[in-house]
Amino acid sequence: MNKSYKILLTGSVIAIGAMGLMANSINSREAERKEINTGPVVQAEGVASKNEEWYRYYPREYDSWKQTKKSDKITDLLREKPQLAIIWAGYGFAKDYNAPRGHFYAIQDNINTLRTGAPTGPSNGPMPTACWTCKSPDVPRLMDEVGENEFFTGKWAKYGNQIVNPIGCADCHNSQTGNLGFSRPHLGRALEASGVNLDEITFQDMRTLVCAQCHVEYYFRPTEWTDKTGKTKTAKVVTLPWAKGLSAENMEEYYDEYSFKDWTHKISKAPMLKAQHPGYELFSKGIHAQNGVSCADCHMPYKQQGSIKYTDHNIGNPLDDIASTCLTCHRDSEKAFRDRVASKLERKEQLMKMAMDTLAAAHLEAGKAWELGATEAEMQPVLELLRSGQWLWDYSIASHGSFFHSPEETLRLLGVANDKGGKARIKLAAILAQHGLIGYQVPDFSTKEKAQALAGVPLQKLITEKKAFESTLLEQWNEEAVKAGRLDPKTLEGMSNKSSWSQTELSQ
């Protein structure tokens, strides 16, 4: 009996000890969880724009964010879809347009693209400061320091030595609390203009709306203001055209009311609109949004590390981690689900190509009509169809994921776009016939080189100028940013440097 008692006592002591160790481990992990999720003060005031400053409190999120570095492939969409160079003739996208890469490359891609030109100083170049708006947490830092209107005044090169950290923590999180928040004022204004009560926004809403700060349609609205010295200036303020609603037709009506145009088409002379990336607007019309699914649910799934649950910040294609994203709700096999997505993409690609071929041919036919002496009165109905049809086409595909976020709306828009382009071509055939030309065959635009030549893009000149810029002013920007403590050069280690035009040179 005594022996049994001793065995029981020993076992009890061991069990109690094990339970104590387990409790200590659980308490330790619980304390860690609370520390990470309490929302520590990363910076007492202002905006903590250097992403590495957030690592201390959010190591898992930061390490996963750095994985966006792996998404470094350059896909030259002008080479894959040469119709684009015709469709955008006279606009920057005819020079250079690539598929999106990881957030880690946001600054590099903005600098490398031929669209931003080759400035030689802070006050020249083709683009305004607004072209930095969605590329860096340095943007809200600067808005906080100099004011929104001052930020939006001047040329892109004005802030080359200031905006140096790629899309990261402070773009979506408040530096004082760590909570999700709007770092770009244009979104709050647009939501209110569209009838949203900002006080009623939920945490789940925010898991989409922080993305909507940038994945939206916008334009640069000229805004006069007076600085502290009394000088009148004009800012090009990022504005979301949501006052009439979030559909493509609502925004077209908004732009028409202001007689707004992004550019005049170089070939057809049509007053054109360029859709940016209306991902949020199209997503809001899809089945996922209607069922309360957020962007983060699919693109930033929760991960588990021990007792710690955190959000994966390796933002990318949900199909790359399908077990943690799509298949948590959809009960298909992985193959069946991938096949379903591929089918949606195939249908979109088919209708998109039809619309692009139609619109590109219509622009070239319009150019020929002008060449033969067509009048403004003859061409006006054609130009209206081209403006509207191309807007609907661009709106439907510019956000890249629209075929999945809102497949029905995407296909509807492509169908209407193709119809309007076709109607423009019918009218143009009649105009050309009236001016003595029947059966006109448009020039071949089947390759990037042929299409850019027709669009008047001096590609080699643009590349030469960009290379000169990168070996002079860009190096100066980086040196100044490092010296001022705005950029830690260690964050650039192991980073590839790619562009579509450097790949073009290598292939020649």
UniProtKB/Swiss-Prot annotation:
Name the reaction it catalyses: 6 Fe(III)-[cytochrome c] + NH4(+) + 2 H2O = 6 Fe(II)-[cytochrome c] + nitrite + 8 H(+)
Tell me where it mainly resides: periplasm
Q: Please list the residues that bind heme c 2.
A: C169, C172, H173, H313
Q: What note does UniProt attach to the cofactor annotation?
A: Binds 1 Ca(2+) ion per monomer. Binds 5 heme c groups covalently per monomer.
Q: Please tell me where substrate binds in this chain.
A: Y218, H277
Sequence ranges of Polar residues compositional bias: 494-508
Q: Which cofactor does it need?
A: Ca(2+); heme c
Q: Can you tell me which residues bind heme?
A: C131, C134, K135
Indicate the secretion signal residues.
Answer: 1-23
Quote the pathway field: Nitrogen metabolism; nitrate reduction (assimilation)
Please provide the record's keywords in A-Z order. Calcium, Electron transport, Heme, Iron, Metal-binding, Oxidoreductase, Periplasm, Signal, Transport
Q: Which GO terms describe its molecular function?
A: calcium ion binding; heme binding; nitrite reductase (cytochrome, ammonia-forming) activity
Q: Where does heme c 4 bind?
A: C295, C298, H299, H405
- One annotated GO biological process: anaerobic electron transport chain
Q: Where is this region: Disordered?
A: 485-508
What EC number(s) does the entry state? 1.7.2.2
Q: Where in the cell is it found?
A: Periplasm
Q: Which residues bind heme c 5?
A: H288, C326, C329, H330
> GO CC terms for this protein?
outer membrane-bounded periplasmic space
Binding, Ca(2+): E217, Y218, K274, Q276
- List residues binding heme c 3: H103, C211, C214, H215
Annotated family? Belongs to the cytochrome c-552 family.
PANTHER family recorded for this chain?
A: CYTOCHROME C-552, CYTOCHROME C-552 RESPIRATORY NITRITE REDUCTASE
Entry function? Catalyzes the reduction of nitrite to ammonia, consuming six electrons in the process.
User: Mind telling me what this protein is named?
Assistant: Cytochrome c-552
Q: What is the gene called?
A: nrfA
